[in-house]
């Protein structure tokens, strides 16, 4: 499988999921949170909403480098599919924020009443395990 095919497989998986685990830290403190997200394939980015006063929000303001996972709960080992990622987190503003918020609220209509900031996780590296392609199959993507 070439890099383009791997990226397409990863993008397809990310577009079908909606919950990620986000891990943020500042060198002294670390915290994980589960967040709903929308995937932007054109930018290879994840958009989420979270307040700056949450523990993970405060940590992302201190250190934009984050890691996390996206993994549904399969019924058997043969169906395991999931992603580990490394990303740069930034709170969006202006036109970027309006576009991301509109897409987020379209996917999660309840978010229309929320005033939380929209963050972009620009994926830097992704490793996907996909046992549906053969036990232990790994797909990789790295931003160049």
UniProtKB/Swiss-Prot annotation:
Gene3D superfamilies: Electron Transport, Fmn-binding Protein, Chain A. InterPro entries: Split_barrel_FMN-bd, UPF0306. Belongs to the UPF0306 family. NCBIfam families: PRK03467.1 (NF002900). This is UPF0306 protein Spro_0510. It comes from Serratia proteamaculans (strain 568).
């Amino acid at each position: 499988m070439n890099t383009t095919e791997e990226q397409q497989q990863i993008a397809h998986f990310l577009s079908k999921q909606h919950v990620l685990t986000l891990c943020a830290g500042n060198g002294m403190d670390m915290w994980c949170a589960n967040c709903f997200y929308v995937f932007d394939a054109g930018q290879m980015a994840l958009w989420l909403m979270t307040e700056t006063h949450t523990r993970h929000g405060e940590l992302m303001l201190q250190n934009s480098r984050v890691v996390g996972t996206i993994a549904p709960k399969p019924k058997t080992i043969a169906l395991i599919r999931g992603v580990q990622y490394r990303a740069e987190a930034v709170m969006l503003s202006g036109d970027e924020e309006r576009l991301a918020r509109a897409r987020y609220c379209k996917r999660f209509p309840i978010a229309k009443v929320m005033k939380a900031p929209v963050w972009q996780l620009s994926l830097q590296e992704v490793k996907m395990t996909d046992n549906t392609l053969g036990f232990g199959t790994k797909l990789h993507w790295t931003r160049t």
